[in-house]
């Protein structure tokens, strides 16, 4: 176990104690909800250009190196790690012993060492707090977080005044100059996404919940497309809202908490999330008024305002944080063009195609320096920034799991209909999408009459309980059908161009869109 020398060391403090320290240290203030409110300066989202993975003998041929998985030399990592240790040795540090992964076979023990008390509270909220010594002899991973230490690009071999470095061989994650807490959780997500596939476990950027009978649903999607909102269902039990593994026998959460977007949060639309923001939770970059009352509509700090809270704050949850293999898999896509249907039933080849494509939108982007507003994107595996191995590794595992379980995969459009974004289209309302999801989870959607949507070759239902029939075929929602066809053809061309980079079976490639007839 890594030994950390510090001026003062606080080990395994309770959430209450960490909150007291954070307030006393001036790291944040208590809001009217009881949640700790903090701000993170200029870094209000992830910094993908500042994320590195150590390239060594173990990782050289296993990682898909490039703009997402940027390589860094072992020597560069070691020098910065030592500098961070020296920096922290002159300060009070907070240490918590946690774990990631709710499965007894695949969990990782985790030691989180932070400069800020609130970062340690975040780790306690988001990771899993084990009961007793649960390491089972497994070696522990270490997160070292020193947000007050700045990097120098010339001296440290990095791109800015901050860096996230993942050392897969040494089981170390280093965060320097990174006040945005989400970097910690996504770094460990990347670690699991690297480690699990060789163990026949598919790591997934998805939410998961379970019905009264134990049936499990998975919700894949980028941030802001509906994972957290749709999985927080008043009639189902939450497993988790963001990161899961799918083994031959179960679906299990990687985390012990939730990290919900707060922009425009309302009690009426999202009561479970609203009620979870209380003492013990963290509000990150949420604007408060002079009385400490949060204004969730105020985006002056960022569109990516967040709340972190433990799973225990969701009353309807699966206690053991895992479930059986899924009965339904939903790919949430936010279509800005308004040409995709609100729901389609996918074959396993289509599932692989749309999984690899990851077509969606960046909504209130989670990344630093992104343009304001909404832009379309293709994000492989519905989470390209977090998957170190080649994308086909994950797609092949997905197809294997679909074949083994016979689960139905659905494409669900949480984006626009009747026209494009900013051009007369309207976004599907949350109640409409919830009705679609309810129809999917009831099992009735796949039993009813269907038709094929030309061009995309998608099988779509002709009716869905609680949804206007005319919404189900996107071509019928546009006043000008020729305008729909032209916009659809444009998107189809984007799909094709994006997919050229993948080396896949012909059956998967042919499952994609063809020309509009």
From Swiss-Prot:
Pfam families: PEPCK_ATP. One of its GO terms (molecular function) is metal ion binding. Belongs to the phosphoenolpyruvate carboxykinase (ATP) family. NCBIfam families: pckA, PRK09344.1-2, PRK09344.1-3, PRK09344.1-5. It comes from Coxiella burnetii (strain RSA 493 / Nine Mile phase I). Keywords: ATP-binding, Cytoplasm, Decarboxylase, Gluconeogenesis, Lyase, Manganese, Metal-binding, Nucleotide-binding. Involved in the gluconeogenesis. Catalyzes the conversion of oxaloacetate (OAA) to phosphoenolpyruvate (PEP) through direct phosphoryl transfer between the nucleoside triphosphate and OAA. Its EC number is 4.1.1.49. This is Phosphoenolpyruvate carboxykinase (ATP). The keyword ATP-binding applies. Substrate binds at residues 46, 180, 186, 306. GO terms for cellular component: cytosol. The gene is pckA. GO terms for biological process: gluconeogenesis. It catalyses: oxaloacetate + ATP = phosphoenolpyruvate + ADP + CO2. ATP binds at residues 186, 205, 221-229, 270, 306, 433.
